Each structure stands twice: as structure tokens, then as C-alpha cells.
Amino acid sequence: MTKAPARKPKKKVCVFCKEGITYVDYKDTNLLRKFISDRGKIRARRVTGNCAQHQRDVATAIKNSREMALLPYTNAAR
């Protein structure tokens, strides 16, 4: 009994490249919350589908937003 060949998962498209967004604003918390897990961690590139440049921009924007107290460092207590 041989297994059927596994399909490759569909490649995710970078949201910022698709919509033509050039600047990721740290004040746009609604957008940045999509890239944070329920524990407050920044989601990986393979999970979000961002390109390398926009993933770096998102990470920087999230860190700036945390410094300005717009986003929490953690969401859940132990």
C-alpha cells in the first residue's frame, strides 16, 4: 500500500504587495493585530505569507507600537 503523493500547500501571497501598501504604520493597530498570535508573539513569515521585506517592516512596526503602548507585549497571563 503506497501513499498518494502529498500536495504542496498553496503559497500565500503577501498582503502588502497585493494591495500596494508601501509603508507599514505602527499606529495602524487593526492591521498589526493580524500578525500577532493570541499570546502576543509576532507570527512567522511562513504563517502570514508576507515577503521578507514586509515581514521585517511588520516586526519593526509591532515593536514600535508596543513601545508606544498601542499594542501589548503579552495578551494572556499564566
From Swiss-Prot:
<dbReference type="InterPro" id="IPR001648">
    <property type="entry name" value="Ribosomal_bS18"/>
</dbReference>
<comment type="similarity">
    <text>Belongs to the bacterial ribosomal protein bS18 family.</text>
</comment>
<keyword id="KW-0694">RNA-binding</keyword>
<comment type="function">
    <text>Binds as a heterodimer with protein bS6 to the central domain of the 16S rRNA, where it helps stabilize the platform of the 30S subunit.</text>
</comment>
<keyword id="KW-0699">rRNA-binding</keyword>
<keyword id="KW-0687">Ribonucleoprotein</keyword>
<dbReference type="GO" id="GO:0003735">
    <property type="term" value="F:structural constituent of ribosome"/>
</dbReference>
<dbReference type="GO" id="GO:0070181">
    <property type="term" value="F:small ribosomal subunit rRNA binding"/>
</dbReference>
<keyword id="KW-0689">Ribosomal protein</keyword>
<protein>
    <recommendedName>
        <fullName>Small ribosomal subunit protein bS18</fullName>
    </recommendedName>
</protein>
<dbReference type="Pfam" id="PF01084">
    <property type="entry name" value="Ribosomal_S18"/>
</dbReference>
<dbReference type="GO" id="GO:0022627">
    <property type="term" value="C:cytosolic small ribosomal subunit"/>
</dbReference>
<comment type="subunit">
    <text>Part of the 30S ribosomal subunit. Forms a tight heterodimer with protein bS6.</text>
</comment>
<dbReference type="GO" id="GO:0006412">
    <property type="term" value="P:translation"/>
</dbReference>
<dbReference type="InterPro" id="IPR018275">
    <property type="entry name" value="Ribosomal_bS18_CS"/>
</dbReference>
<dbReference type="InterPro" id="IPR036870">
    <property type="entry name" value="Ribosomal_bS18_sf"/>
</dbReference>
